[in-house]
């Protein structure tokens, strides 16, 4: 019986020879028939891979056998069997492209000078103690927050992670600099970097959600501070943490609640936008709001 799984993990640690790690990871993923994306830099590894359960287990076991990766927090979720079109293993200057690689410092323990890590239960303790003074700060692209976010979260106007520096330097969030700010993202990696950038720019009390939305959803499902669906970077495109999840997103055609993104049919655009299955089925073409007036 087929049991497809998806794993997500990252490790910040100094790597003396990223290219050697790339070759090893590529061979390892190919050996176990995995597809997905692995990014390696001098600061560590960031991976999202899918395959059959036993193959993924073997890959994880061998990856953790390398001492710098032995404590990798590997997050598991259900796959569909064809979640990624191919395998990509690359070396890049940054694990997450904020455009601020010179600000990030890592050692064998991880990122130096980042926000205080909060496990899901620690976040609830903070909320009990500080209440409305706590600010959730979304560390993802704004599009991802259209279908799910922490309650009353601040969602910066970002299309890519490169936009965050301009956002936090714009002055529009200066009123948050003396408040407890909890950064969050899908699995935690973006907030490892974002929290450093925010602290370097005068945010005095910065936290990061340990394990990201994934670990929080596993712990509290729909019974905590998370609302809606989680955008994911594979064929599923979204996942939920329990039955009865109410989507925050709405179809651009009919306004019906939906968590389903589709790509604009204009090959020069390919922008993702929300469209329910019924409206997609009823239209031969699917263009985003910017392209439709010009092409339809």
Curated annotation (Swiss-Prot):
The active site is at residue 185. This is tRNA uridine(34) hydroxylase. It comes from Corynebacterium kroppenstedtii (strain DSM 44385 / JCM 11950 / CIP 105744 / CCUG 35717). It is an enzyme of class 1 (oxidoreductase). Its EC number is 1.14.-.-. NCBIfam families: PRK00142.1-2. Catalyzes oxygen-dependent 5-hydroxyuridine (ho5U) modification at position 34 in tRNAs. Keywords: Oxidoreductase, tRNA processing. The keyword tRNA processing applies.
